[in-house]
Amino acid sequence: MKKSILGMGIAVAALAASLYGLTGCQSHEGDDNQLEADVDSFATYYFNWHFPKTLKYCTRSSEPWLRYAASNVHKADVERLRAKEEDATVEINDITFGNDGVTATASITVRNFLQMDSIGQEAHLVDEAEFLLPMSMEDNAWKIRMVNLPRSGKRSRD
């Protein structure tokens, strides 16, 4: 009797584990690995000012913001970028999914980057700052959804 109860318990546990694996524990759409890789790629390109390369990681509605950022790069900014010894680096801190399952916010830390200032002002070198990147599903993939240029509350070191 004990063997059949134990066997039944193991069978139920195995069935539950199988169903859990098949249904997954995701409460959101899309692929987590794709999301993280694309957040990293977008942020690395964006904060190193490779704006055309960021387009594939953004929603279509984000393109005007990227064009705006690119149009505000001045000669002095380019010289400062070239003078930097190291590229900007990115660390993903957290990704929070919206209740709708098709929106998310990525919290990132960016180090050693030039941050654009107001129009007509040179960019400022920043040691470290945190940013929140809104995301949404577009064409069955996670994309950065820019509603403005990424901004942080941290001050520059210049």
Spans of features found by a protein language model:
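Sec-dependent bacterial lipoprotein signal peptides
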Residues: 1-23
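Exposed beta-sheet edge and beta->alpha loop/turn motif
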Residues: 97-158
